[in-house]
Structures are given as structure tokens and as C-alpha cells.
């Protein structure tokens, strides 16, 4: 302050550096002496600064001399500079320490910020830990948010484990893992509580439980335990529902008036079994749809969670095969869960249907039940896949029904074999064959309604034909053995025709129909031969044919002597008027008129061919006789004149008469 005062006063007292020199413009206007006087007079000596300055000058013992006044300013500046230098020297180390402290402060601030960031990222608050692990806290969006943060902390701890000091990372990872495990345990117990009150019939299933399942899937063991609990609960619910549907009363004994009990139709086995299977199918479809909403509606998030859990727990996969570890099949898991839910229903279903199968001894009913079971087995196979407890139960029941069907068929065949079976007088199919074919028709109509694939349809019905068709045809063959020819052949053809008419309308018996057709043709060939022989014998053509085959020169053969030829010609003429009538009479018991016509035509054709051979041989014999005789021997003896009928005449007569006789015969049969 004193220094400032002296500096300021010097500018007023004339100790300036010549600012008011005579050469300046101001000097030309003002007298220097006047300025100094004015400056002195204008100063207030009552000012404390002036007094302090004067007191200081007095203490320094400064003499008021011209030299002193000239040096005073310099001395003051020098002292000021020296004072400042002393101050700088004295406070230099303080400045250094202050700078060091500022650097330390910056470092501390950086460490504090790093610590805060570390705590914010890696350290969870007590409230967050309580939200994760305490069962008193709800499972809400905040819970899942904190759990996501905890999992992120656990993953980021890998960075800390990469540092030189791994202790911090290990401690944080241990604590975080403990918190996460506690959170999953809390989530597991919460889902179990929710499952107890879950209503799958409600189309708006809580989104929170779906989210909880997606998260819990990251712990496959807990997720599987949860599914086991759920499956057991649903199995009990569906079993109770099936019991109510069967009886109309709940497990507790309360009657439900809104339900018509299935057991009311127990007197109708097929409807009873069908209603039980229909209820099971409806329940299975509803269960699957509800579980799709619960487990698959959010895409493959659960599958991703389970896969992530499997990847993070390799020790759980040591005993598993590579196929099981490689990929989680969500659809297969869903099918398995649905199958477990209906396992209780499957047990009751197996018991009830098994009782129906064993208590009814109707052959057709047993097969209809087997066919119904086959239909539902295919339906459930498309719904649940190939590996299913319900499918196994249905397959077992189907096999049981087929065994019952086969056993009843064998018993029926055995009873028929014990009876003496004879062919009816008109050689029509016997009653037991009619009964068997009628039964087979009912079976085929039932099989026709099944959803068997076209590729396996015919092969699938072949075992049924073996049980329900072949024994009856075998019985018919045994009856035919007791008949003489051609009655046995006619009886056999009638049975085959009836069988073919029964099988032909169905597309899954084409092979059998073709086999029957071939067999009919074989037996028809036998009848053709029989009719052919009949034509030969009754027309007296057979001795002529035999003679032609035995000798080359017929002139000396007894059969071709005039008397024999005249007798043969007369026999032929007597035969022709009634030939077709007699031939038709042989086949009057054959029940297919078109087949009768075909057999007769072919036999007549063979007869005409043989007659033309005889005619040709007789004409040739006459020509040879004419060449061997001389003119003087007289006219030759012509054998052809003794046997005048021609092949053309025979063909015309038979072709015309066969039509007329066939029409007359059909009218008589009709």
C-alpha cells in the first residue's frame, strides 16, 4: 500500500519522467510551477495513506535532498522488486507442493470416477440383491432387468480375470454367481406356484410366466424339473377331466349336470370306444395348442435359452450322445410334454377299451374297433410324432382287437369244419360261404373308410383276407372234392364268381380279384374240355378222330367202311338238333350266363375244327382212291358221299343255334 502511495504521489509532485516537459503541448498552455503548486495544494494531508507514507519515510531517516528525491523512486522500485523476489523465493516450494497436490487431486478424482464406474457396473446394491433372491419381492420387470444385469456382470468378469490380480474378479464372480443362482431358484419356485393356478383354457395366458419360462430355460435342470412338475399337475387335471367325462361326476363326487356321461352309451361298444377316443383327441389338441402359446409363441427363445444352458454346463452332457447335444428340438420337446400330460388318460383309455374288446365276441365288432383304433393311432401320430406313450397304448389296443378278431374267426371256422358241409343241389355257393362273404363285405366297408395310405392300402388288408376269406374258400374247395366232374368244377366256379363279385367293388382287393379271375379261367378251361369231349362222343366223331391218328390209310379201317360211316353220319344228324340243348344242360347250374356262352362257344369251335380235319381226310381219301383205280374197274366208292356233312354246315348250324339256344336257356334260367 505504501509503495502504491509513493508511486501515485510522485506523479502529482513533479517527479515525473517529463510528461509535462516544456516541449509538450501542455507546457505551452500551462506553467510548470503552477501545475506543481496546484498538485501540492490539491493533496489532502488528512489521508491515512499519506500519513503512513510520511511516517515510513521518517522512520527510514531519509533526508529531503535533491539527490534523495531523485533516487527515491528508484530505491522504492528496487525495494519492491527485492520484496517480490523474497516472496517468490519463500513461496516457491509452496507452489510446487500446491501443484503436486492438484495433480494428486486429479488422480484421486480419476480413481474416484473409475471406482464409481466399477461399482456401478460390477457391484450390485443390497436392494438389487434382495430383489433377485428374496421371495418376498415380486417377479416383475425390475427382477428380470436386475437378473440381466447380473448375468452381464458375470460375463464381464472374464475381463477382470485377465488382469494380474485375479482375486477381485474371482470374488465378484463368486458373489454374482451366488446371486444369479438364488434368482433362478426364486424364479423356479415362483413358476411352480403359478403352475398350480394356471388355467390353460384361458386364451390370454400371462406374458410374465412365458417370460419366466424363457429365462428359466437357461438352467436346463431347473427347467426340466419345472416341466416335470407341470406335466404331473396337468396329468392329474386331465385324468380327473376324463373321469368326469366318463361318469358325469367329479373326482370329489359332485355331479356335473352340463356333461352327458360317455358311459351311458357303453351298451354300444363302437360308439363307446369312439366317444372315449374323441374326447382324448379333443383334450390332446387343446393341450397342444395351449402349450404352443406357453412355450413356442415367442419363437425359439426357449430353445435358445436351453441351448445356451447346455453350452454353459458341459458337465451335464457327458453321458449324452452327440445327437442329443447338438441341437434342441422344440417341437419334439412339445410333443413329449403333451404326451406326458395325457399319459394318465392313456392308462384309463387302455383299461376301458381293453375291457370292451375282451367282453364282446362279435367278429365284425372286434374288427371295427381295431379299425377305429388304427384311425386314431394315425391321427395321434401326426399330432404327437412317432414316439409317444399314447401311441403305444393305441397300438397295443389295436393289436389286442385284431387278436380277438382272428381268434373269433378261427373259432367260427373250426365250428364250420366240425359240421358236415355239402353242396346245394343247384351247385350254388353254400350258406357258410354266403355268410363269410357277407361278413367280409362289412369288414371291407369298414376298412374302406380308414385313412390308410394308397401305397400300403392293399398290403394292409391282405392279413384280413387271410383270416376272413381264405378259410371259407378252402372250405368250399373241400366241399367240391366230394362232387364228381363236371359238377365239382361248376360248384367251384360258382363259389369263385360269388367271391369275385364280393371283392371287385373295392380298390384294395385288386390282386385277389385278379387271382380269382385266373383261377376261374383255369376251371373254365376244364369245362371247355368237358363240353368238347361231350360234342365228340355224342356226335360219333371221336372214333373217326382216333382212327385218323392211328393210321394213314383209312380205306381198310373198320371205322371208315361204308356201314360204319353211314352209322356215324346218322348219329351226327341225330345229334345236331339237340347238341346245344344237351350241352347247355351240362352247364345249367353255372351261375354266370356269359361264362356259359363262352365255354360252349369255345368247345363248339374246337369240335368244328376237328370235324373239318375229318372232312379233309375223307376228301383226300376219295382223291387217292380215284387215282388208284383204272377206268375198267368202274366208278370208285366215295366215302365222302357216305359222310356228307361239311364243316361249313356244322359251323352255320352251331353258330345259329348256339345264339337261339343260349337265349332260350337264359330265359329258362331266369
Curated annotation (Swiss-Prot):
Q: How does it sit in the membrane?
A: Peripheral membrane protein
Q: Does the keyword Transport apply?
A: yes
Source taxon at top rank? Eukaryota
Kindly list the GO CC terms recorded for this protein: Golgi membrane; Golgi transport complex
Annotated region (Disordered), positions in chain: 1-32
Bias class Polar residues marks the residues at: 1-14
Subcellular location field? Golgi apparatus membrane
The primary location reported for this protein is Golgi
Family note = Belongs to the COG6 family.
Give the protein's function. Answer: Acts as a component of the peripheral membrane COG complex that is involved in intra-Golgi protein trafficking. COG is located at the cis-Golgi, and regulates tethering of retrograde intra-Golgi vesicles and possibly a number of other membrane trafficking events.
What is the protein named? Conserved oligomeric Golgi complex subunit 6
